[in-house]
């Protein structure tokens, strides 16, 4: 893991503003930070080069594009094999990158190995994904699903 760079109060103010609106102008940021536009531009470039700002994206509400069902799927993989060419973890990690329904995958401690956040149209789409994709993967031993009933908090902003 890379070491974090030192952020001062102005860097944090800039980051909070950019997380609220990634299209904010440098002039508006300058007003927020109490600096000139060129000083803000230099700080933003430094944050980008250091990887603190990874990218700028459009946030798309899943429901607005027909993906009304969110599922969290706990996945357990088969045990490691002696064959180095068939490592279940490596096979699964590679496969999950190609599944468009999976928008987030985290390796876990505890009973299950991975937690997937999956966006699908409806229960039929979910059933097809589980039956035809996830459970067909040779490394997957078991999975357990929970469905989102109501989203109480949903943010991409990091508390800086």
Indicate residue ranges for each PLM-predicted region.
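A compositional/biophysical signature of low hydrophobicity enriched in polar/charged and small residues
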Residues: 1-160
């Amino acid at each position: 893991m890379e070491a974090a760079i030192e952020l001062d109060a102005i860097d944090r103010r800039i980051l909070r503003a950019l997380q609220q609106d990634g299209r904010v102008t440098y002039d508006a940021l300058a007003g927020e930070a109490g600096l000139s536009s060129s000083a803000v531009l230099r700080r933003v470039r430094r944050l980008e080069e250091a990887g603190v700002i990874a990218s700028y994206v459009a946030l798309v509400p899943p429901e607005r594009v027909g993906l009304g069902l969110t599922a969290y799927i706990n996945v357990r993989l088969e045990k490691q094999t002696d064959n180095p060419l068939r490592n279940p973890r490596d096979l699964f990690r590679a496969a999950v990158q190609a599944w468009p329904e999976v928008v987030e995958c985290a390796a876990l401690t505890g009973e299950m190995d991975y937690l997937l956040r999956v966006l699908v149209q409806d229960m039929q789409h979910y059933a097809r994904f589980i039956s035809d994709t996830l459970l067909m993967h040779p490394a997957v031993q078991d999975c357990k699903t929970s469905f989102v009933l109501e989203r109480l908090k949903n943010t991409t902003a990091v508390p800086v």
